[in-house]
Amino acid sequence: MSEAEVPPVARGQAALLGPAEVRALAEEFGVRPTKQLGQNFVHDANTVRRIVATAGVGREDTVLEVGPGLGSLTLALLDVVDKVIAVEIDPNLAARLPVTVADRAPELADRLTVVGADAMRVKPSEIPGEPTALVANLPYNVAVPVLLHLFSELPSLRTALVMVQAEVADRLAASPGSKIYGVPSVKANFFGAVRRAGAVGRAVFWPVPKVESGLVRIDRYAEPPWPVDDAHRRRVFAVIDAAFAQRRKTLRAALGGWAGSPAEAERRLLEAGIAPSARGETLDAAAFVRLAATQP
């Protein structure tokens, strides 16, 4: 069996973090989790192992991690893949992460690259190499914008397995017609197939959050069914935003501002094969793409 065929089994070379280690590191580094940065650190080794296993990443993957914090998930990833790029907005945590990895997984330390940046604004030029998978415990207050930004900016990303607030996970994976189907659902589906990939209880975090968490997986379309260039994406996203800004209204009324008038909105809707009396939550991503194509 070649190296490429070896299944993604942990090397067992990383000493994963437990509750005592997480608190000790936080005290040592002078870290106080803040709501502003959405910091809730995972302190359960079985949970991070499950996340890595569910992500399905292997040796050949270059994994992008956002918000590595104290390094719980980072260590579990390094035990399976050959390269991890961690993007951390907190300068203190960004500086300390390599120290933690060198201490707890010295044989794997050279596989980690830390980028001190805001994941909502990070540019491809700041990311070394071409990451193939996003695996992260995303800061809950910015999870959706970060996810969409990274899929927009990094075409090399083939998959994502992210932990987010359970309610957000449900919205991302919602289907047309659902009460919780909305802007995040459609925009995520613009890039790929989205599905719920599990639940995560509150007890595995420090501090303990007030909400439950969930895992969401996105698999980018191998052959995109529509153009994915930035200009086209912006046109499609503008229609999505307009349709859901007044979600109780018919699309004829809701898209009046986008089209210039309700009458013009009706004309474009009919051209795209969509009933003017329909509402935004009934349309899938393909319908919004057709609608955007009617714009002169």
From Swiss-Prot:
GO cellular component: cytosol
UniProt-annotated location(s): Cytoplasm
GO molecular function, one term: 16S rRNA (adenine(1518)-N(6)/adenine(1519)-N(6))-dimethyltransferase activity
EC code: 2.1.1.182
Catalytic activity: adenosine(1518)/adenosine(1519) in 16S rRNA + 4 S-adenosyl-L-methionine = N(6)-dimethyladenosine(1518)/N(6)-dimethyladenosine(1519) in 16S rRNA + 4 S-adenosyl-L-homocysteine + 4 H(+)
Domain of life: Bacteria
Keywords tagged on the record: Cytoplasm, Methyltransferase, RNA-binding, rRNA processing, S-adenosyl-L-methionine, Transferase
InterPro entries: KsgA/Erm, rRNA_Ade_diMease-like_C, rRNA_Ade_Mease_Trfase_CS, rRNA_Ade_methylase_Trfase_N, rRNA_adenine_dimethylase, SAM-dependent_MTases_sf
Residues that coordinate or bind S-adenosyl-L-methionine: 40, 42, 67, 88, 118, 137
Class in the EC hierarchy, top level: transferase
Main subcellular location of this protein, as a coarse class: cytoplasm
Cited Pfam families: RrnaAD (PF00398)
Spans through the membrane: none
Sequence similarity: Belongs to the class I-like SAM-binding methyltransferase superfamily. rRNA adenine N(6)-methyltransferase family. RsmA subfamily.
Purpose: Specifically dimethylates two adjacent adenosines (A1518 and A1519) in the loop of a conserved hairpin near the 3'-end of 16S rRNA in the 30S particle. May play a critical role in biogenesis of 30S subunits.
Protein name as catalogued: Ribosomal RNA small subunit methyltransferase A
Lineage: Bacteria, Bacillati, Actinomycetota, Actinomycetes, Mycobacteriales
